[in-house]
Amino acid sequence: MSDLKETRLEKAQVLKKLGNGPYGIRFEVTHKAAVLQVEHQDLANGQERQLEVCVAGRVISRRVMGKLAFFTLSDESGSIQLFLEKATLEEHSDLDQESPGSFSQLTDLVDSGDWIGVNGILRRTDRGELSIKVFSWTMLCKSLQPLPDKWHGLSDVEKRYRQRYVDLIVNPQSRKTFRSRALMVSAIRRWLDERDFLEIETPVLQSEAGGAEARPFITHHNTLDLSLYLRIATELHLKRLVVGGFERVYELGRIFRNEGISTRHNPEFTTVEIYQAFADYTDMMDLTEEMISFVCSQICGSTTIQYQGKEVDLTPPWRRITMHELVLESTGLDFYEFGQDISKASTAMQSVGLNVPDHADSVGRLMNEAFEQAVEGDLFQPTFVMDYPIEISPLARKHRSKPGIVERFELFIAGRETANAFSELIDPVDQKERLLLQQSRRQAGDLEAHVIDEDFVNALEVGMPPTGGLGIGIDRLVMLLTDSPSIRDVIAFPLLKPESGSQ
């Protein structure tokens, strides 16, 4: 045990004997720090206002000068200075210096990091700092761990993620990020609800992990002796709801994929999936740019923002261009000219310095590889990349006029995929054929290939109206709107590799 922790434990025992904590039950709060700062800006230097307030929070800093002390108290809204005077405390409490709540207890037993509640009136110091002139105080929680140095904060980035509770105390930007995230989620739900979309929850535990090309987490139900999977998408169940007659439906929730971890990927993440009957992928483009621009204006106050030193303009309309056009523009390769000649397409890619992966077994997959290598990272302004190869889009409807292509788009902002959408495939025969092809890939070793969900195919056989479907990555959108470089900055408790020596 560290000397500092031992000292704080001793102080906690003293407080307990004196009857002042160290762990309070409740405290009646009348005002928040930030509200006081705003509502009493007119209070002149050196003046007091006879408004009695009760404020609670964490002591962030303390300065003791004989019979006078200045503490900074922080609550969820902000911070305010405490003006603590020995004579004032004694005058209002009639306590001797050994009694609970005395000035000596305050200066001797209260440390930075402790939670206290105070009662007093407002006073602006001669230097212009709005303060609470404290009449009485109560210990609410004794902190046994010292806070990081206020000048250097929590400088170890990984420690910020492992001890988010400390990060939130010492880093105002982290608090702002998670507040913005909560407001963003609320704004998305409000926007959808106002347009008659209904949020319905679908299963997290599933007998088949479908709806995306991803490896699932596997668990086991003991009573049923049944292997189950954490969902990798909400798509197939939401489509079942459209079959059942819900014409506008969505779900905002957690997704789980047993994949790598990076600044863009966390195995547990959040999406919103939206389905609209009688719509196609062009309608979903309209919906996407309208909703995201609305959310951006709500959170950032404008549709023009800064991300990592560059300006991003989210004002609609956004650029719409096909994958084929982008690859041709960037590499000079016209993949439509290759037909089904994989060898010719591979040679052409190598001639312009692109890698040809072993798993690319079709021209469509090679075009997608060329896009990912040569184009994707440069799409900084919002861009709808349209018309994807059918081989990589088994749940999307065939394009109405382009063979080998489906009506699908992905939205790219700041070089990252942010949304994915289709004109949904509603032909049950076509759907089953494509899932059988996916099954063949799976049997050949592709563990991310789709599985066949027979009940989903059965639902399509019951009949699903023409539908547009959309999925948006909430975490990546929060990254964009809060200017955060890593997905770990916007997930309160991201998954991390265990520290060395821990179990």
Curated annotation (Swiss-Prot):
Major subcellular site: cytoplasm
One annotated Gene Ontology cellular component of this protein: cytosol
GO MF terms, alphabetically ordered: ATP binding; lysine-tRNA ligase activity; magnesium ion binding; tRNA binding
Swiss-Prot/TrEMBL keywords: Aminoacyl-tRNA synthetase, ATP-binding, Cytoplasm, Ligase, Magnesium, Metal-binding, Nucleotide-binding, Protein biosynthesis
Binding site for Mg(2+) 2: E417
Stored PROSITE patterns: AA_TRNA_LIGASE_II
Reactions catalysed: tRNA(Lys) + L-lysine + ATP = L-lysyl-tRNA(Lys) + AMP + diphosphate
EC number: 6.1.1.6
Cofactor details (free text): Binds 3 Mg(2+) ions per subunit.
Pfam families: tRNA-synt_2, tRNA_anti-codon
The keyword Membrane is annotated on this UniProt entry: no
Disulfide bond residue pairs: none
Coiled-coil zones: none
Binding site for Mg(2+) 1: E410, E417
Family (UniProt): Belongs to the class-II aminoacyl-tRNA synthetase family.
UniProt subunit comment: Homodimer.
The protein, known as: Lysine--tRNA ligase
Organism (species): Prochlorococcus marinus (strain MIT 9211)
Encoding gene (name): lysS
